[in-house]
Amino acid sequence: LAENQKNLRESYMDKIKGKARSWIDRRVLNKVGLYMAGKPVYPDFSEVDHVNPEDTQPVPGIPITVGLDFGRSPAAIFMQNVNDVWTVFSEVIGDNESAEKFAPKVKKHGAKYYPGFEFNFWGDPTGGDGQQATEETGFSVFLKYGMLVLPPTTDNNIELRRSSVEMVLNRRNGLKVNPMALVLRRGMAGGHHYRKIKGAPGMFSPSPVKGPYSHPVDAFENGIIGGG
């Protein structure tokens, strides 16, 4: 019996050796993951380590950071940093809508779920670019509704975005995501990924696939950098 247990342990270790945490979660621990024909942008994200078992509430007296991504598929991520632990509480996801339509939704969400809290808004630097039709920017539209949005960086540096999030993921208890932030969870679990290049084994696209999961993850990155 003891020999069988030893063999089982060795077989288990061989199975997971060199595998990404997301692979272990899906294949070995039977955790909720997202299958995709590509490579996750954040393979260190884990349902075990980074998702709260139930929704939690923000700590009073500490501002809530809101990460924003603009465009026709906008996203807002409500989060808070307490003692170097980031907690994502909720999200607002837009569908083929302008900043003019999205901004009131974000303001209403904040007032409903986090009354009395101060908010710090951080948005993609391209949110300062005018729209062809109106010349209004995402920043100016949000300001019209009483929300001052600042850019977390001046040049939208990709390496800075990735390294900032990876630092949080690799820090002990660095990130906790509430279950209600479902789209962000799916994005971090692999929905936000690099596409596999056909006919080139082991090769992936240099940039992540743009889709329903990329926008909330981009908003999350903006919040991490701006609020960090």
Describe the residue ranges of each PLM region.
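Short beta-strand scaffold segments in enzyme catalytic cores
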Residues: 74-80, 221
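Acidic, Mg2+-coordinating catalytic module of metal-dependent nucleases/exonucleases
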Residues: 208-228
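Generic recognition of flexible, low-complexity loop/linker segments
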Residues: 52-55, 63-66, 76, 107-110, ...
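Short, structured patches in soluble enzyme cores that scaffold and shape functional sites
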Residues: 1, 30-32, 80, 90-92
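Mg2+-dependent endonuclease catalytic cores in nucleic-acid-processing enzymes, primarily RNase H-like
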Residues: 82-209, 228
